[in-house]
């Protein structure tokens, strides 16, 4: 869901850059509405669920990195990134953070994308394990 929401916001930005302000506003409002739905549907205490209807699940939200890469300020609030970064710290194993609650393996590319959630101090501490 997050990837699609970011894609809508990116499309809104493209419309804005091409001078189509009213169309841009429509898609930005749609994306923000989906963010609000996601925040409520995926909330699971100290983290966000892997799937809306599965409480107790978790996953790396690596596709939210594109909000930061594309500089889409104000879409998903910073609290989402902060909350997820704390959760990932509790899930970290010697080889990294598993992709989700179903498996113990990870992928370096997706974990790298998730690293965008962390503050600089955490990244420096993590560096000694790489």
Where are these regions (language model features)?
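Mobile, glycine-rich extracellular loop/lid and propeptide segments
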Residues: 1, 8, 15
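Extended ligand-binding clefts on enzyme/binding-domain cores
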Residues: 2, 25, 32-130
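Short alpha-helical scaffold segments that flank and stabilize functional sites
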Residues: 7-10, 34
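Inter-helical turn/loop segments and adjacent helix faces that build the functional surface
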Residues: 11-28, 73
């Amino acid at each position: 869901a997050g990837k699609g929401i970011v894609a809508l916001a990116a499309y809104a930005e493209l419309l804005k850059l091409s001078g189509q302000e009213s169309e841009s506003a429509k898609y930005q409002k749609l994306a923000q509405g989906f963010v609000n739905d996601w925040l409520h549907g995926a909330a699971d205490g100290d983290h966000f669920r892997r799937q809306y209807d599965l409480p107790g699940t978790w996953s790396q939200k690596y596709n939210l990195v594109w909000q930061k890469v594309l500089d889409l300020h104000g879409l998903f609030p910073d609290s989402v990134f902060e909350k997820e970064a704390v959760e990932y710290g509790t899930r970290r194993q010697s080889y990294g953070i598993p992709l989700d609650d179903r498996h113990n393996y990870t992928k370096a590319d997706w974990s790298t994308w998730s690293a965008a959630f962390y503050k600089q101090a955490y990244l420096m501490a993590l560096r000694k394990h790489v």
